[in-house]
Amino acid sequence: MLPPALNIPKWLEANSHLLQPPVNNYCVYHPSSPATSGYTVMIVGGPNARTDYHINSTPEFFYQYRGSMLLRTVDRSVSPPAFQDIPIHEGSLFLLPANTPHCPVRFADTVGVVMEVPRAPDATDTMLWFCPNSACKQVVWEKRFVCTDLGTQVKEVVEEFSADLAKRTCAACGTVAESRYKEGELTQPPRFPPE
């Protein structure tokens, strides 16, 4: 028998305490479940001010349930890489193409749903940090791994980067990259898109 549909408001009422930093997500449909056919569906809350970019070998589907978020992306097919911020407003959908470096920035009192399609068993995910010096923007550090548990593995990589000054120091210009955005460094997009 199939499970009932997930009621997001009721789920949040009972489980919002599960959306804790640094990842702020909870996997409501896990890829190991026979019912999901390998799909991952997460509810993600804010705030989440991590500065890392994630590369997933498959597309990711974003639905912004409450409030607005900022999806920071990088096009590495051009030189220098092109950085683009994509606001995802309340009630909006966005499909991120596979292999696109992205940094989902979530603000306080926001909730979104992210769905990831099944990865190949040997597919590697990448987490990377770019130099915050606007004249440089080189990759400061990156780590590749086979993703078996997004919530725990992402947290471990973020903590590894945060704890090591050498990993956070840009080899090209010497600027130190932080693992979190500073308060007020980014502006939250409006809740709804401008008319």
UniProtKB/Swiss-Prot annotation:
E.C. code: 1.13.11.6
HAMAP family: 3_HAO
Catalytic activity annotation: 3-hydroxyanthranilate + O2 = (2Z,4Z)-2-amino-3-carboxymuconate 6-semialdehyde
Record protein name field: 3-hydroxyanthranilate 3,4-dioxygenase
Residues annotated to bind O2: R50
Pfam families for the chain: 3-HAO (PF06052)
One cellular component term from this protein's GO annotations in UniProt: cytoplasm
Binding site for Fe cation: H54, E60, H102
Subcellular location: Cytoplasm
Alphabetical UniProt keywords: Cytoplasm, Dioxygenase, Iron, Metal-binding, Oxidoreductase, Pyridine nucleotide biosynthesis
Gene Ontology BP terms: 'de novo' NAD biosynthetic process from L-tryptophan; anthranilate metabolic process; L-tryptophan catabolic process; quinolinate biosynthetic process
Gene3D superfamilies membership: Jelly Rolls
First-listed, main subcellular location of the protein, grouped into a coarse class: cytoplasm
Encoding gene (name): bna1
Biological or metabolic pathway of the protein: Cofactor biosynthesis; NAD(+) biosynthesis; quinolinate from L-kynurenine: step 3/3
Swiss-Prot/TrEMBL cofactor(s): Fe(2+)
UniProt binding sites for a divalent metal cation: C131, C136, C170, C173
Binding site for substrate: E60, R106, E116
Domain of life (superkingdom): Eukaryota
